[in-house]
Regions:
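N-terminal pre-catalytic "stem/leader" segment of glycosyltransferase-like enzymes
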Residues: 1-65, 365-369
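Conserved catalytic-core segment of nucleotide-activated headgroup transferases in glycan assembly
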Residues: 13-25, 150-236, 323, 350, ...
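Short internal beta-strands
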Residues: 30-40, 117-122, 209-213
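Extended catalytic core of nucleotide-activated donor transferases of GT-like folds
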Residues: 41-111
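Donor nucleotide-activated moiety binding/catalytic core segment of transferases
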Residues: 61-65, 223-285
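Active-site-proximal region of nucleotide-activated glycan assembly enzymes
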Residues: 89-154
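Catalytic binding pocket for nucleotide-activated donors in carbohydrate/polymer assembly enzymes
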Residues: 225, 269, 278-345
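C-terminal alpha-helical cap of glycosyltransferases
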Residues: 332, 346-369
Length: 369
């Protein structure tokens, strides 16, 4: 039996986790979600897990938690109590994060505590090495395992070159747990919305779809206000604004008054606007062209020249939007997304997880640290 351990009170966290089950990465038949009780989120977590028939268990105190039956424990988020769970040495402990990004959160030293760490490809490995999180020895001994697009998430978008009936996607990230990790383009001056409106007008595209990060407004409620005001701004230009449906807990008023809910299975996207976030790599994997907002913090982890050149082409500078195509897109994608072992590429995502469980169960690295 496998476990996914979750110590997080943010409601959006459980939806990010559940998406892996919906996508078929994790199997309800052999994986249990173990989450800590928090008054603010308990009922929501319980309801969502029950809705998708995901085996789960909750606890009040980590000291009373029995983890002896689990062969592998997966972690999507860092938390202090993770350190306590790692003392259960009958299991191997794997940090899979919840998407690949160039945020500072992806290189926190706490990541060293896990037996194994999954990343999407060479970009992730480089991030760890350049920032002293792991060593070449760790890489050579497969403590860091490249699992390609297994855990980066899958969107409901597809690339389309025909502007007719196409959408512009805006996917702002949240404001982060601390100010230094604030990557959101949502702002009081509505800069991102104004930029998108100008692009829509120039491109003669009338449809906008918004997928705001589910944690938007958790640290600072004014970011929900910025989103609200931005939507009204777009609609004032007779643009049709639709909601992906992710951003709806605590903010159903947005859906009710400002947004048209859509039931489409796939959304044809002509152009996407994103922040420094996992959406960048997710859309790149699906060949959807992106422009990226980089706010005043300017703390994206982009050290390799290949990424610097790429960012020069996709970053929105002032009010100027570059129209230059990225010829090296396949090379960029291969840098972000790759595999430690060639056999993984042809496997389905759930088979890759089976492979990972089998691999770490046979390896002894976790017992050396």
């Amino acid at each position: 039996m496998r476990a996914i351990y979750l110590d997080n009170k943010i409601k959006g966290a459980i939806n990010q986790l559940i998406n892996y089950f919906i996508e078929g990465v994790f199997d309800c038949n052999n994986t249990k979600v173990i989450f800590k009780y928090y008054k603010e989120s308990f009922l929501y977590y319980k309801r969502q897990l029950k809705k998708y028939k995901i085996n789960h268990e909750y606890f009040f105190s980590v000291n009373k938690l029995d983890m002896s039956s689990y062969k592998v424990v997966f972690y999507l988020f860092n938390a202090q109590s993770n350190c306590r769970i790692l003392t259960y040495r009958n299991a191997k402990h794997i940090f899979i994060t919840h998407g690949e990004s160039n945020k500072l959160a992806s290189i926190k030293p706490i990541i060293r505590i896990y037996d194994y760490v999954v990343c999407a490809g060479d970009a992730g490995v480089s991030r760890y090495l350049e920032n002293g999180i792991f060593s070449r020895y760790d890489v050579e001994n497969h403590r860091i395992i490249k699992m390609g697009d297994t855990f980066i998430g899958k969107s409901v978008f597809k690339k389309i070159s025909d502007k007719k009936n196409a959408y512009i996607l805006y996917a702002p990230t949240w404001e982060g747990g601390i100010k230094s990790e604030q990557y959101s383009s949502l702002s009081e001056d509505l800069y991102a919305f104004k930029t998108i409106q100008k692009y829509a007008q120039k491109s003669d595209i009338k449809k906008i779809i918004i997928q705001a990060h589910p944690n938007t407004g958790h640290r600072d409620k004014k970011y929900r206000k910025y989103l609200n005001q931005g939507i009204k701004f777009l609609k004032s230009y007779n643009l049709e604004v639709e909601n992906m449906g992710i951003y709806n807990h605590k903010t159903s008023f947005l859906n009710k008054f400002f947004l048209k809910r859509s039931s489409k299975d796939i959304y044809p996207i002509y152009q996407a606007f994103v922040d420094i976030s996992a959406m960048e790599i997710q859309l790149l994997n699906e060949y959807i062209p992106i422009f990226i907002f980089i706010n005043k913090t300017k703390n994206a982890i982009v050290n390799k020249q290949i990424l610097k050149d790429y960012y020069d082409k996709i970053t929105i500078q002032s009010d100027v939007i570059q129209t230059e195509s990225v010829k090296e897109l396949e090379q960029i994608k291969d840098f972000y997304i790759g595999y430690s072992f060639d056999e993984l590429k042809s496997m389905t995502k759930n088979k890759r997880v089976d492979w990972l469980v089998d691999f770490v169960s046979k390896e002894n690295y976790g017992n050396k640290i």
